[in-house]
A protein has these predicted regions:
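Beta1-alpha1 glycine-rich phosphate/pyrophosphate-binding loop at the start
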Residues: 2-80, 168-190, 384
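Rossmann-like NAD(P)H-binding beta-loop-alpha module
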Residues: 142-190, 194
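FAD-binding core/adjacent interface of flavoenzyme oxidoreductases
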Residues: 1-13, 70-154, 230-232, 236, ...
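C-terminal catalytic lobe of FAD-dependent flavoproteins
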Residues: 7-9, 224, 233-261, 334-417
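Residue-level detector of alpha-helix initiation sites
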Residues: 17, 42, 116-118, 138, ...
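A Rossmann-like FAD-binding core segment of flavoenzymes
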Residues: 32-34, 81-98, 105, 172-270
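FAD-site-proximal beta/loop scaffold in flavoenzymes
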Residues: 127-151, 222-230, 235-306, 311
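Mid-to-C-terminal Rossmann-like scaffold of FAD/NAD(P)H-dependent oxidoreductases
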Residues: 1-9, 15, 28, 285-383
Length: 423
């Protein structure tokens, strides 16, 4: 339980996936005290993944309401006080948060689920009309409206958001160029075989991919908005829509002002507690000690947000444990789905399984230990990989390289050999 003998009021700053899930999990576990969920956005708490996928494509049947995690009546029914406003200050001594409008909320335990913000592009013209980032529902609505009339889009950054938007833009009939500073797409998150697949996928769809290129300036005027992107080598790319997708920066300002340590995010231990035992940090903003990997991590995924929220809810209702959930991620681009199980924290060998160039998995090993699996259009491999990694089922590169090897078959053989159900 929290520091007080009786259940104390909980204030959650941030109403994204992590913040919402914390409030919901607390009520599911019977937490009786007051719960205040503070949102800096006007919208009800909503799902973010569809923003760069189905929602962005402008499908008529996909409404804003379909993004909602719960309708407004849920918060009333569960006695969750949903407050709109921006928190300006945390007073850890008085255990109070103060909003920009001057209102304040006392807490027995504070949960910081403040997320992250898009990294800006520091070049001339970055504030021209028609230059977008994609993080919030408002961002997505603006992009969707621009995409309806845009003819030429330039995407700066070939990460998940950039490529998902590029796919949606091409499917909308827009000409698309992706500019990436590194030598391949998704360079920080996937192996070369997987990156090469997505290069082929986007080029087959008609997208121009430019690697090893920086942006020098964005051109346009107040009347027309953005009209071109100037590359570092002097080339000019015509554009009436530009998406900046070069990553995000965790929101750490509130924590730093409150005297909490910051280390690549709001620093927390394996139980997601900050240096103040009355303050937790979770989700995209939290740099945490992961029991599986040892080092401090900051992960950006729905799975991580939900797992963090549930752990905090458990701790506040009497069960304290370290966070050790296996990370997993996914991305949909055109008709292709990439799923990643585990985390590549340094591998020294790879094994590719699958003969189809459009459906394969890459197994990442460090020594004799499987660390992560990337699966392209092979959902059964992804599920088997998660079970293998979660349960620590042994697998060597030699075994994985056998001609008839499958992840599902290996899992079944190990299950039979141990007599333990691994389903």
């Amino acid at each position: 339980m929290v520091a007080d003998a009786q259940p104390a009021s909980v204030v959650i700053v941030g109403a994204g996936q992590a913040g919402y899930e914390t409030a919901a999990a607390l009520r599911e576990r019977g937490y009786p005290a007051r719960i205040t969920l503070i949102s800096a956005e006007d919208a009800l708490p909503y799902e973010r993944p569809p923003l760069s996928k189905a929602y962005l494509k402008g499908q008529e049947h996909f409404s804003d309401e379909q993004l909602w995690l719960r309708p407004a009546s849920y918060y009333t029914r569960q006695s969750i006080d949903l407050v709109r406003g921006t928190v300006r200050e945390i007073d850890p001594v008085a255990r109070t948060v103060r909003l920009a409008d001057g209102s304040g909320y006392d807490y027995g335990h504070l949960v910081l689920a403040v997320g992250a913000q898009p990294r800006g592009l520091d070049v001339p013209g970055a504030r021209l009309r028609g230059v977008h980032t994609l993080r919030t529902a408002r961002d997505a609505a603006g992009l969707r409206a621009s995409l309806a009339t845009a003819r030429r889009a330039v995407v700066v950054g070939a990460g998940f958001i950039g490529l998902e938007f590029a796919a949606a833009a091409r499917e909308s009939g827009c000409e698309v160029t992706v500019v990436e500073a590194l030598d391949r797409p998704l360079a920080r998150v996937v192996t070369t075989p997987t990156a090469e697949h997505f290069t082929r996928l986007h080029r087959r769809a008609g997208t121009e991919l430019l690697f090893g290129q920086g942006v020098a300036a964005l051109h346009g005027d107040d009347h027309k908005g953005v009209t071109a992107v100037e590359l570092a080598d002097g080339r000019m790319l015509p554009a009436d829509l530009v998406l900046i997708g070069i990553g995000v920066v965790p929101r750490t300002e509130l924590a730093a002002m409150a005297g909490l340590p910051v280390d690549g995010g709001i620093a927390v231990d394996s139980r997601l507690l900050t240096s103040d035992p009355c303050i937790s940090a979770i989700g995209d903003c939290a740099a945490f000690r992961h029991m599986r990997f040892g080092n401090r991590l900051r992960l950006e995924s729905v799975q991580n947000a939900v797992g963090h929220a549930r752990l905090v809810a458990e701790r506040l209702t009497g069960r304290s444990r370290a966070y050790d959930e296996l990370p997993w991620f996914w991305s949909d681009q055109f008709a292709t789905t990439l799923q990643i199980a585990g985390l590549d924290d340094g591998h020294d060998s790879e094994v590719v399984i699958g003969d189809d160039p459009d459906a394969f998995s890459v197994l990442l090993f460090r020594g004799q230990e499987l660390r992560a699996v990337e699966s392209v259009n092979r959902p059964a491999d992804h599920l088997a990989a998660r079970r293998l990694l979660e349960r620590g089922v042994g697998l060597s590169p030699v075994e994985a390289g056998a001609p008839d090897f499958t992840l599902k078959g290996h899992l079944a053989r190990r299950r039979e050999g141990s007599g333990v159900a691994v389903g």
